[in-house]
Amino acid sequence: MGATGDAEQPRGPSGAERGGLELGDAGAAGQLVLTNPWNIMIKHRQVQRRGRRSQMTTSFTDPAISMDLLRAVLQPSINEEIQTVFNKYMKFFQKAALNVRDNVGEEVDAEQLIQEACRSCLEQAKLLFSDGEKVIPRLTHELPGIKRGRQAEEECAHRGSPLPKKRKGRPPGHILSSDRAAAGMVWKPKSCEPIRREGPKWDPARLNESTTFVLGSRANKALGMGGTRGRIYIKHPHLFKYAADPQDKHWLAEPHHMRATGGKMAYLLIEEDIRDLAASDDYRGCLDLKLEELKSFVLPSWMVEKMRKYMETLRTENEHRAVEAPPQT
């Protein structure tokens, strides 16, 4: 029996091969030695995983990537809350769209008008998270052309009030920076931009029934700014632009000069002004010019008369403001 037991002892390693544990020598009786290759593989894989985690940590130190990962996680919840807000005001958009369809005609797509209005709301909401230095010049360019009469004056006074507060709150060394000084030099002419609305281009006599006009959206594309809606009004605030009222837009939609836009703003520009800009040094040789986008047209006498009065109002307003400016300072 003893010989048989000695003969069967070499079969012990096969137990280790099957996944068992191999005992140590007699002096180390009771201790387990982890010589199983499977255990070695587990330890090796754990080291590799730790290595991967460390690599991922170092590759995600970019702030933009980290913030975008967080945004991706929160985006579904944000979208749900945004949808809840729009559902709250959807009844107003629906009533307005149906009213537009009743006034303009059945060819108006009410659902499309609602979608465009919602997208416009989201675009305007972006301004809540814009840098203050970028938003203020934009408002300075856009508001004088959109607001009329006393509204423009009140808005200009409202915009001018925060400026002294910013100067008082900043340390003197911050203002003496060369970049800030250059920006300040540009800011002053922009704030006084409405005074430049004079001269031959702002003479109402130049408007008659043979004057050709273009849509502001087409002028934007013709000057190579098609990707940014309304950029032409920001870059060239001195241009005369006329905001079409519902009666004007109804006439424009009938000859198919423009689509029925409902409540969306539609501006008319003088074709001659746009072509003069295209021939100026700022655009001469520009590869993005697409003057074929200028689909010009003439307007009826009643609409031209409204545009003359509007131009005269702006000229008179600017002349009064230029006279009243010295006593205010």
UniProtKB/Swiss-Prot annotation:
GO terms for cellular component: histone deacetylase complex; nucleus. A motif (Nuclear localization signal) lies at residues 164-170. GO terms for molecular function: DNA binding; nucleosome binding. Residues 147-158 have a biased composition (Basic and acidic residues). The modification Phosphoserine is found at residue 161. Keywords: DNA-binding, Nucleus, Phosphoprotein, Transcription, Transcription regulation. The keyword Nuclease does not apply. It is found in: Nucleus. Residues 56-147 are annotated as: Important for dimerization. Residues 197-316 are annotated as: Important for DNA and nucleosome binding. Residues 1-22, 147-178 are annotated as: Disordered. The keyword Zinc does not apply. Residues 159-173, 216-237 bind DNA. InterPro entries: DNTTIP1_dimer, TdIF1, TdIF1_C. Its main location: nucleus. Monomer and homodimer. A minor proportion may form homotrimers. Interacts with ZNF541. Interacts with the terminal deoxynucleotidyltransferase DNTT. Interacts with TRERF1. Identified in a histone deacetylase complex that contains DNTTIP1, HDAC1 and MIDEAS; this complex assembles into a tetramer that contains four copies of each protein chain. Component of a histone deacetylase complex containing DNTTIP1, ZNF541, HDAC1 and HDAC2. Identified in a complex with KCTD19, HDAC1, HDAC2 and ZNF541. Increases DNTT terminal deoxynucleotidyltransferase activity (in vitro). Also acts as a transcriptional regulator, binding to the consensus sequence 5'-GNTGCATG-3' following an AT-tract. Associates with RAB20 promoter and positively regulates its transcription. Binds DNA and nucleosomes; may recruit HDAC1 complexes to nucleosomes or naked DNA. The N-terminal domain mediates dimerization. This is Deoxynucleotidyltransferase terminal-interacting protein 1. It comes from Pongo abelii (Sumatran orangutan). The gene is DNTTIP1.
